[in-house]
Amino acid sequence: MSRFVTVGETMVALVPKEQGLLRYGPDFSMRIAGAESNTAIGLSRLGHTSSFITRIGNDGFGDFLIRMVRAEGVDTSGITVDKDHRTGVMFKEIRPNMETAVHYYRDNSAASCLCTGDVDEAVIQKADMVHLTGITPVLSKNCRQMVYDVMDMAVEGKTLISFDPNIRKKLWKDEEFRPMMKELINKSSCVMMGLEEGLFLYGTKDVKRLADMLFKGGRLRYLAVKNGAEGAWICDDQHLFHIPPW
């Protein structure tokens, strides 16, 4: 069994080899994208055993994703191949002003059909930690239920829960998911968020105040707050440390 398990969406990213608008048909290279798959890969590169649970389409893009994740030493036995839905794809566009635009083709994707039945409870409960993000629960109602169920499995098995809100307002559309995000944070053992996400969810960019709010009444053990070029903060309920940027 793996020490770390990540659960959520992965996609194929088509990245242009040079600057140019999509309408001019730039050449693309194919890469893997997705916070959860990237986390599983990063943990494996650091020498930890990791497993990735997701759902992909029965297509060439899905085959590519499995091959790339497996090549990094990640256990892919928890990946479900969906014969009825396609693998999600994203295109990046580097515009003349060097601004990057991202175009998603993920509606009704295989990953959006991920459900509790795709998750082996024993894998979650025998792991040291399970990692989830706020992207998965806004993809669909079944994804949302799956995230809650995985957290319940982890709590029952005394597995630590790592959560990154990873807020993407484009995915939220007209729905209000802030209460849900706060609820998921309260269920988590370790939380990583950006300073702007803290402001959006809790109304403050004061890290000490943010920590005071998050450590009250929940299961939280550790909080990491990122602030780009300014570095990051990490804290428990007693200590707060600033980590300078690399």
Regions found by a protein language model. Give the residues of each.
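Conserved phosphate-binding/catalytic region of the ribokinase-like
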Residues: R3-V5, D152, E156, K205-W246
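Conserved N-terminal subdomain of the carbohydrate kinase-like
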Residues: T49-G134, E156
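Glycine-rich phosphate/adenosyl-contacting loop at the front of the ribokinase-like
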Residues: M1-D75, M98
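Structural recognition of alpha->loop->beta junctions
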Residues: R70-V74, E175-F200
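Glycine/threonine-rich flexible loop motifs
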Residues: T136-Q145, K173, L201-G203
